[in-house]
Amino acid sequence: MIYVSSDSFFVFWRPGSNQNILTFYRAMKLWSTWITLLILTFFCSECNAKRGGRGGGGSSAMGKHYSRSKSYFTRKYSKPGSIEHTSSFRSFVFGATSGLLMFNAGRHIIQDSSEPISFGNRKYFWGESKYVPDEELPVQCINKIDPQDPQFGKVFFDNESRPQEIVYACPADNNCCGYDCCSNSTIFTSIFSLLVILLIVSVLSIFVIECVRWCLHCTYFCKHGHGRDFEPLSI
């Protein structure tokens, strides 16, 4: 007959293991407290970001009321983006099948500067003067053209002048990344997301280790009728 002590939490734990259980659950309580605080901080930062976005939405409504007022649109300079997307964009613009440029005497001549470059469900314009505002995309992205660029540095209008920038549009809550739009996430949010994931994985790992320990104790107890003299996989 198996005797179950009233002060034991598990039947297969040897005497004195209650202290280990108490320590384990104290650790779990501490971990859960930290996880709760981190998750609350993460959601607070997300709410603040969304609140800021809604504030921008109010100015957007005002911009629509005044029919594309300049204050409605936001100019942003593009920062480095996806290498793959940038490479695909360049290949499309300078590809023979696009019909956008005509190569002549070492120069790429723009065929029709009034026509935007249509690539990936987005329109790109040869400079701010060619840009056509869109109320649904209030962020105006400006990608400056480096004169030393081996490709865009050799692009010219038909009047021998060179475009200074490529302009495209993004939604209100986006940033300009290369020739694409990217989400407006912050380093702070990314770090906390990573910490939350690491903490969750750590807690799950501890639970798995404890389950293995309990299974080993149970197996040993059922086979020998008493607990182990030592605890395997002790944390």
Swiss-Prot record:
Topology of the protein relative to the lipid bilayer: Multi-pass membrane protein
Coiled coil regions in record: none
Pfam families: CX
Name used for this protein in its record: Uncharacterized protein C07A9.12
Record's keyword terms, sorted: Membrane, Transmembrane, Transmembrane helix
Gene Ontology cellular component list: membrane
Subcellular location: Membrane
Domain (CX): residue spans on this chain: 124-185
Residue ranges crossing the lipid bilayer per the database entry: 27-47, 187-207
